[in-house]
Amino acid sequence: MSPSFSGAAIRQAFLDFYAQRGHQVLPSASLVPEDPTVLLTIAGMLPFKPIFLGHQDPQYPRVTTAQKCVRTNDIENVGRTARHHTFFEMLGNFSFGDYFKKEAITWAWELVTEVFGLPPERLVVSVFREDEEAFALWRDAIGIPPHRIRRMGEEDNFWAAGPTGPCGPCSEIYYDFKPELGDEQIDLGDDSRFLEIYNLVFMELNRDSEGRLTPLARQNIDTGLGLERLAQVLQGVPNNYETDLIFPIVQKAAEIARVDYFQASPEQKVSLKVIGDHARAVMHLIADGVIPSNVDRGYVLRRLIRRMVRHGRLLGIGEPFTLPVVETAIQLAEAAYPEVREREAVIKAELQREEEQFLKTLERGERLLFDLFANVTASGAPKQISGADAFKLFDTYGFPLELTQEIAQERGFSVDVQGFEQEMEKQRQRARAAHQTLDVTAQGSLDELAEFLIETEFLGYSQSSARGVVEALLVEGKSVPQVEAGQSVQVVLDRTPFYAESGGQIGDRGYLAGDGVLVRVEDVQKRGDLFVHFGWVERGILRVGDPVQAQIDLACRRRAQAHHTATHLLQAALKKVVDPSISQAGSLVAFDRLRFDFTLSRPLTPEELQQVEDLVNTWIAEAHPAQVSIMPLAEAKARGAIAMFGEKYGAEVRVVDFPGVSMELCGGTHVSNTAEIGLFKIISESGVAAGIRRIEAVAGPAVLEYLNERDSVVRELSAQFKAKPQEIPERVAALQAELKAAQRALEEARSQLALLQAERLLPQAVAVGNLQILAAELGSTPPEALKTAAEHLLHKLGEGAVVLGSVPEAGKVSLVAAFSPAVQKLGLKAGSFIGEIAKLTGGGGGGRPNLAQAGGKQPEKLAQALQVAQERLQAELSSGLGS
């Protein structure tokens, strides 16, 4: 292997190339991004996202970087394919409103062909199907033959960093590992032949949460060249793991496992590659400040470490082994990323602690598993570990399913994987149903603290501010003596005015202020008798025992109060207008809206919804005062107070009463008079389950915000239609009628065009005895018109068979077969025949013996499929006629 093509040399050559073309070389950003919408830095462009969005001015018009990235969305493929990784380096050049497509394409080609010496004849490029400018540049400016420029759809060649944010069409350079197959078989989806090495994104659009695309303030360039991928090509190795960037780590793991990598079994190689990959990710994550935990990026790190340990066990390594492996990773990375050596002690300490802890988990899990083996054997039942037991091992003891399966197999047992997945889905449903804010470790820590901490005194019914003392601080689920600026923290006070989430009402927001310290509180949760304030330290140092002034955000509290009281009024109105037997099935009381689920087997009519809304607003206008009292549960029920079905209440309950309107058992906060709500507006009514309906609504200031948003939409529609607001429904109806008429006319025109085109296909028919065969492609003809054309052709041909195919839209194939009675008598059925042909295009279908339709999703294989159809028809009809 030439030293000039080492991983380090590739990285430096890339940066030097663009530095010579006016780019500022910037160091890699941290794997912990400033962007709150993503856990980790997943792409080279992520540090520049604010610039691409126009939220921040660039310091330099052109930059180039070698960016550390971590992605875990395909973690199960790591080690099993040649190119999947969790950690990788993305080399990139970026332009912020400076150069655009021409320069990006020209320089990319110059770099890969002249600097790295890749033969042009082994390169293929792709462009977005609608990007004519990029296609012309590759063809005319670079000189690539058109057949080696592939037009691709949005799924392949329209790039985005995520569901929202900067995006745009892209163009990719692929390396051809098998040029001897020729240009006739260029399929960029064939990973064994083609490897994408360079992606050029022409970043000119922004996609919002509604999926709308709008132009960015500047036309930008964002490129990405995978260092590991290019190293594989230049170093002539079969996969990324055998490049000099990773292979020394793999070899170290093999040495510890006493395995010869080149003589290892396929599964052993997978484990060695997983260890080599994860070691790099773990090293860089800890170096960038991530520590193992059960939440967010800390959980990603913990999972990677545990996968390393598990794959070590699969290799037969029974003792801790990760430190020498990561030391090799540090040696490889320290020249480019000095921080990994500077934080070596932290990296190894966190890794050692996590590995030792997980090994204990594995030992404990194995003991429990062996007990299960013994119990099942003694019972005489089939040798299978139930899904519930496998899930308990996983969920309670962190014992991986794969390890349970491996050990079970060694003992002649199977594992009910389907049952395990069912238990996993149940847990996901529980997680979705419950607002989880504490991780498992944090819950355990609080349980321990609760043994000696006093119950938090809640003052929030009468006070918005109160003096309290810090009883406990938790970071990442662990009790700590102090926290500093920039840290997320959970604070337990001896007394607080903050309402903790319960009864559907979300927790208060606000702040805790002390001597030189300020903690912003974003949520409050109740754990037993303790109120836990979730937030982050904006400035100063907060210590256990410090006195603080706890102040709620009054504006948020008032919004929550308005929505909570409105929820009570809504339930009362539903009982009065719709059905007295209606009962609450769930609720959400937030700052910006309310949601009320209730029992009813049918949708509400528009008239009922309006009556309910009007009645609530009437009660608001009547200014009913609130009366709150504490009384025995039996007395409250005797007075007619509404209790939520299934809720557990103590001997004494809090009753919120708006006399003559509503009386409920409730621990939430409310307005002192219904007039404080102002207005109430129902937004929607829908079904959420059998017998359960849901109303979403807004109250108080949120009504004005909702109406302003609606008004903005109406004004925009008025401008678009050049009509008064009251005229919009009529204009929309007219437009819909015009659209339907145009669609009918278009379909008719397409059918006529298809028939004209079909007529031209008649000379292509082939005679087999007295039968005529025709298999042909009919452009972009829609399915219905294609069927009409097939019937028309069969009528013209007389006795025979017609198979037609088309590509009605990108990524879709339409097929139809029409067989005459004479063909059917020979045993050929249109339905089964076209179904088999459709499989060749990645689809399926069928229908009647005389006429059938099918579809596919691989247009590039349509011509081949039609050729197969022609050959099969000729062969089978010849055979039938001959017999």
From Swiss-Prot:
Which GO biological-process labels does this protein carry?
Answer: alanyl-tRNA aminoacylation
For activity, the cofactor(s) needed are: Zn(2+)
The record, for SMART domains, names: tRNA_SAD
Which pairs of positions does the record mark as disulfide bonds? Answer: none
Cofactor binding, note field: Binds 1 zinc ion per subunit.
Q: Where in the cell is it found?
A: Cytoplasm
Superkingdom of origin: Bacteria
Q: What is known of its domains?
A: Consists of three domains; the N-terminal catalytic domain, the editing domain and the C-terminal C-Ala domain. The editing domain removes incorrectly charged amino acids, while the C-Ala domain, along with tRNA(Ala), serves as a bridge to cooperatively bring together the editing and aminoacylation centers thus stimulating deacylation of misacylated tRNAs.
Q: What's the name of the protein?
A: Alanine--tRNA ligase
> What gene name is given for the protein in this entry?
alaS
